[in-house]
Amino acid sequence: MSIRNLFSWLLIVATITLSARAFAEGEWVVEKTFHVGGEGGFDYITVDAKSHRLYVPRSTHTMVIDAESGETVADINGQEHNHGVAVVPELARGFISDGAGSIVMFDLKTNAVLGTVVAKDDADGIVYDKSTGLVLVACGDAGVLITLKADADPKTAVIDTPIELGGKPEFLAVDGAGKVYVNLEDKDQVAVVDLKTRKVLAHWPVAPGGSPVGLSIDTEKHRLFIGCRKPQKMLVMSTDDGKVVGDLPIAVGVDATRWDGHQAFASTREGKLSVAEEKGGKWETVQTVTTGLGTKTMDIDNAAHKIYLPTAEFEEAKPGARPVAKQGTFMIVVVGRR
């Protein structure tokens, strides 16, 4: 390579690096709001970045929404009290957790229901672990983690033997290497589960936090991001030994955390999205985005740099009570980088 070509190549690399760094340091802003409407409550939202679809459980049905236009693509009926959705693009399948004690399997292309599998009480947080080919569901009232083979025959599928967790699970995160971490809300702990041996390896306390609910993971740097309600914190925990290495204050009513490869996020019912990152070995909040009352859950499309937060308009709250959502006002707030 000539000196001139080498210089040109180095200049291109430097430009790309600086551009990426500048983008990573950009501010997050509310870009738009999809006014979706429809009936029912809302819980965990799931983004399928490959198809640009949003999956939104609405109590008795699950809405499929175009992530770019906000238009409703389909509506999957037949649930009683749904909570979350896991998608498996390589199998063209989706899975809905139903708190009434079931997992609904559906086709990602047609959105048709393929089958319903008996689960355990209060089937709640749900994720897919590609390393094992398992769909994992935290069942709160039952106090167990259940697993289901993602490629199981929808007509004959049954769950594997449940794994007793020693507490009430809320959400979970997989490391892609055979382990899953599960928040135990009532025990102020994170349970570490080996999916190969199907045993709980450890219970890690979340002090100085408590009532852990939201959970996400940085598999490269071995970090968990734990959203706690009592007290209100986002904790950063090492997956090597359970040591808390970051302690960040957040707003009221957290229900989800996410990681984008550079920053960690915590969404809250109060309508404040906390953005945190590690600087000089110390975790700090670098931005707080006002997203609106009720935006307690979220999902992120890391490729598009978009965060989607479901909420609604609310009636004025009575003293000592939570505000009630107005019928037909469901919407999705879209946050992106500026």
Give, region by region, the residue ranges found by the protein language model.
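Predominantly soluble domains enriched in secretory-pathway, periplasmic, or organellar proteins
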Residues: 21-338
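Bacterial N-terminal signal peptides
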Residues: 8-18
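N-terminal secretory signal peptides that target proteins for export/translocation
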Residues: 1-5
